[in-house]
Amino acid sequence: MNAPGWGRRGLVAAATLGAWAGWQAARVKRARRRTDRTDRFRHVPDDPRHCVVVAGDSTAVGVGAGNPRLSVAGRLALALRDARIVNVAHSGARLADVPHQLRRVFGLIDASLCVVLCGANDVLRFTSPARVRRNVRALIGLAQRADVPLVLVPPGHIGAAPLWLPPLSWLLSWRARGVRRALFGAAHKQSGVEVVDLVLPARKDPFRAAPAAHYAADGLHPNANGYGQWFEQLVQQSRAVQHRLPPARRAPRVQLAHRLFR
């Protein structure tokens, strides 16, 4: 026979869980209302000398930037003034969707570089690590067959985004580590492939030091400052991007550290 105290504790626990779920659901609903409808940045200069393809999810679109020119694609156009920027990303994409995005353009244009920002939706939708590895290998194979250098930019600390409440934030942080580990493993030592690591030590991570200054109003996507930080990491870590920059714009290249277990 159950003691009366256990029944009361169960009711309190159920009420607490219900309140937490309602609060988190309300935050997600509010975030969806606040998510801007940024258009994909595309650019064709007067005399393009090479073509950069940008693909992936809403972060490749530039959701949260406010101005498409302040997205990663927009900043690439500013830095690579003689480059045509072709953006085929769409919000909600997972890694499995990226090859479909690229097949539409690789057969039509002569791309000199492909930058893929993707993986967040694989974290949020619980794509298994095995499937992440398969999807990344398919993406890499497509780029290699097209002879296009590939730069992969997986997400940073998704669980640390202000949108999420504990313990969901902890779960998403754990999930993000698994997805990143699978992605890095699939890309390891692949010819023509670089991976940019957006996960920085806590003391050096501006997203954790000053979240209000780097996250958009939805509490999930970067804002213009946040995309600026991502772009700086892209420039510092990617040899393929640095090679295409004017000499004055090149930064000291950072040796990529596999900080997967922190």
Q: What is the role of each PLM region?
A:
Residues 1-53, 235, 241-262:
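N-terminal secretory targeting modules
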Residues 51-53, 59-134:
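Conserved SGNH/GDSL esterase-like catalytic core that processes O-acyl groups on lipids
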Residues 161-197:
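Substrate-gating cap/lid alpha-helix
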Residues 156-159, 201:
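Short "lid" loop at the C-terminus of a central beta-strand within the Rossmann-like core
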Residues 223:
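Short, conserved phosphate/pyrophosphate- and ester-handling motifs at nucleotide-, phospho-/glycolipid
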Residues 117, 153-154:
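Alpha/beta-hydrolase-fold catalytic nucleophile elbow
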Residues 146-149:
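A short helix->loop->beta-strand "cap" motif at the edges of active sites that frequently abuts
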Residues 87-89, 154, 197-199:
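Residue-level recognition of beta-strand->loop/alpha-helix junctions
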